[in-house]
């Protein structure tokens, strides 16, 4: 599939647990591999053998459509045997702890486990207890590294660079693992990152991550090269974070009028799923500046790249 990693800098990590701890070079290695994976995915014959004979387990404790199916497709395109573990019908629903689940899965001798869990840090716990490689597919409000990678890839392919760009991340920053991972990755790659949202949806001390903070969306969008919208994660809210959805859209929903404040060639992105009419207007989501559908294609390529990179650390890999 790809050129042997020995001919270029190799990804030095056995797991992908987050963007935190990765260098700009680590990120670039994965993005470059993903560029090659895009070409593979666009061929008639998409099947490769990098993971032939290997077992990939998708262990999702939270519902997912895009991420789980993307990892499944990525694994199959690399030749892996892919098992999707349904938590709804598993021992977890019968009271089994995460540690017990980890020990059970480890006894099956998988090569890579992809995990999504509602608890921040759960993926790190599991990685300490298993012998295989572990990929974080989202842990609580902590991180979502492959989403950040596919967003960076989308930006780089459209703009030709990331360094020096102004990226405005707008919406529910407080509950968003996507926001955290994107802040870490884009900052490491040289972008200027802004976060925009009401005070109730901005984490305390977010400035310490090196971002510019705006509570006025119009002010925050001025001169932006990339506008990245986030959905309201109402399933993680237990109080009155916003007065109403109508008021939220009025002040923080991306419509054509607000988008006009960004650069004329600004790109619009969204990790999905979208709430049309809440954080983004349909005319913007489906408009010429939108790269939302392209992000989905980049997701498969990035996850192929991650699995390929980790395969170099598997026994006899």
From Swiss-Prot:
This is Aspartate carbamoyltransferase catalytic subunit. SUPFAM superfamilies: Aspartate/ornithine carbamoyltransferase. It comes from the Bacteria. It comes from Beijerinckia indica subsp. indica (strain ATCC 9039 / DSM 1715 / NCIMB 8712). Its EC number is 2.1.3.2. PROSITE patterns: CARBAMOYLTRANSFERASE (PS00097). Belongs to the aspartate/ornithine carbamoyltransferase superfamily. ATCase family. It is an enzyme of class 2 (transferase). The keyword Cell membrane does not apply. The lineage of its organism: Bacteria, Pseudomonadati, Pseudomonadota, Alphaproteobacteria, Hyphomicrobiales.
């Amino acid at each position: 599939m790809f050129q042997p990693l020995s001919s270029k800098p190799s990804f030095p990590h056995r797991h992908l647990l987050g963007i935190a701890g990765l260098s700009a070079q680590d990120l670039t290695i994965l993005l470059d591999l993903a560029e090659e994976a895009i070409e593979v995915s666009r061929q008639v014959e998409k099947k490769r053998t990098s993971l032939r004979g290997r077992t990939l387990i998708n262990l999702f404790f939270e519902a997912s459509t895009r991420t789980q199916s993307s990892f499944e497709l990525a694994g199959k395109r690399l030749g892996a045997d892919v098992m999707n573990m349904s938590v709804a019908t598993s021992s977890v629903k019968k009271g089994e702890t995460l540690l017990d689940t980890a020990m059970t899965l480890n006894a099956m001798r998988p090569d890579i486990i992809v995990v999504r869990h509602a608890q921040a840090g759960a993926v790190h716990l599991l990685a300490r207890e298993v012998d295989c490689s572990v990929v974080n597919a989202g842990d609580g409000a902590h991180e979502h590294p492959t989403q950040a990678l596919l967003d960076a890839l989308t930006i780089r392919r459209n703009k030709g660079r990331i360094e020096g760009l102004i990226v405005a991340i707008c919406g529910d920053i407080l509950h968003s693992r996507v926001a955290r991972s994107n802040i870490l990755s884009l900052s490491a790659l040289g972008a200027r990152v802004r976060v925009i949202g009401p005070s109730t949806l901005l984490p305390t001390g977010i400035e310490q991550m090196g971002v510019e903070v705006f509570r006025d969306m119009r002010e925050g969008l001025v001169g932006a090269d990339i506008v990245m919208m986030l959905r309201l994660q109402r399933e993680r809210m237990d109080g009155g974070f916003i007065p109403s959805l109508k008021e939220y859209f009025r002040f923080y929903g991306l419509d054509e009028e607000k988008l006009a404040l960004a650069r004329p060639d600004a790109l619009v992105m969204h990790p999905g799923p979208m709430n049309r009419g809440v954080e983004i207007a349909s005319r913007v989501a489906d408009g010429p500046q939108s790269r939302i559908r392209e992000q989905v294609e980049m997701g498969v390529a990035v996850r192929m790249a991650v699995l390929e990179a980790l395969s170099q650390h598997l026994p006899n890999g």
